[in-house]
Amino acid sequence: LQSPQPRVITTSSLMHRHGRINRDDLQLKQSYETQRAYNQTKLANLLFARELQRRATVAGSHLISVAAHPGVALTGIGTNRSRQGLLSLKDKFVGLFLKVLMPLLGQNAEQGAWPLLHAASLEPIEPGGFYGPAGFGEMKGPPKAARVGTVANDQALATWLWETSEKLCWVDYSALGKPPVDKSKKEIIDAV
């Protein structure tokens, strides 16, 4: 991070748009489902990337934080779900969708890496940006700016998640400072 313009790339997913952060059960000890955990994790990743950029900017750092998603990439994600133990009906449906439709709607793993490579190496890049495939539904195609789900724009939620993560991981990133929360943004945190 000491380079003239360090860049942090965080992998998210289209599924972040279905993610919800439950502050009372962040680690899903009471309500674990495979797909729910995946969606929440990918939302948390995007919130983290955007919060890191906000904090780096406030601290006067040249760090650039961006996130990217691979779209629907043909990897083992759809074929290895049965090894995850007891699956809910919803998880089984998602598994069937992945197994049947991924080959039709998706792209190979190499093409899925394009948005992440774009985020990591191309100039100019939007600090705090989010990138994914340009094709139908952002499922495949060359990289472009991706659509950010509503909850991923919640600055209050991002701040809460950042501070909670610091406590859970026993780390302190106070050197980055704490940016003010934009009160003009609708706070969604209590609704999720």
Positions of PLM-derived features:
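Rossmann-fold NAD(P)H-dependent dehydrogenase/reductase core
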Residues: 1-91, 167-182, 188-191
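Short amphipathic alpha-helical segments at helix-loop
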Residues: 29, 33, 37, 100-101, ...
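C-terminal helical subdomain
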Residues: 41, 92-146, 155-159, 163
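A generic alpha-helix propensity feature with a strong bias for hydrophobic helices
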Residues: 73, 106, 155, 182-183
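Hydrophobic transmembrane alpha-helices of multi-pass solute transporters/permeases
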Residues: 125, 151-176, 181
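Short, solvent-exposed polar/charged micro-motifs at secondary-structure junctions
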Residues: 139-142, 185-189
